[in-house]
Amino acid sequence: MTEFLFCFSCCIGEQPQPKRRRRIDRSMIGEPMNFVHTAHVGSGDTNAGFAMGGSFQDQMKSKGGYTPGISEVAL
């Protein structure tokens, strides 16, 4: 019986431990690079944007790369 276990122990190696991510603290984070402020969204701004006919969505479309979830044709 020990020969049987010996055969398998030679073929199966130890599994490598998954690498742990380093914990990030504040000293590792720098200033934002290439940051462009496009709009401010506060707690009341989102509701006001929908009431004004989607002006917020129009602003975002003008920035490029914006694909709304519902097409304008469906509205």
UniProtKB/Swiss-Prot annotation:
An MF annotation (GO) of this entry: small GTPase binding
Gene3D superfamilies assigned to the protein according to its UniProt record, in alphabetical order: CRIB domain
Compartment(s) of residence: Cytoplasm, Cytoskeleton; Cell membrane
Disulfide feature: none
Any one cellular-component term (Gene Ontology): plasma membrane
Topological category with respect to the lipid bilayer: Lipid-anchor
Residue intervals of the CRIB domain: 29-42
Keyword annotations: Cell membrane, Cell shape, Cytoplasm, Cytoskeleton, Lipoprotein, Membrane, Palmitate
Main localization, broad class: cytoplasm
Lipid attachment site numbers (S-palmitoyl cysteine): C10, C11
InterPro entries linked: CRIB_dom, CRIB_dom_sf, SPEC
Protein's GO biological process: regulation of cell shape; regulation of Rho protein signal transduction; regulation of signal transduction
UniProt record similarity statement: Belongs to the CDC42SE/SPEC family.
Function of the protein: Probably involved in the organization of the actin cytoskeleton by acting downstream of CDC42, inducing actin filament assembly.
Name the record gives this protein: CDC42 small effector protein 2-B
Originating organism: Xenopus tropicalis
Gene name linked to the record: cdc42se2-B
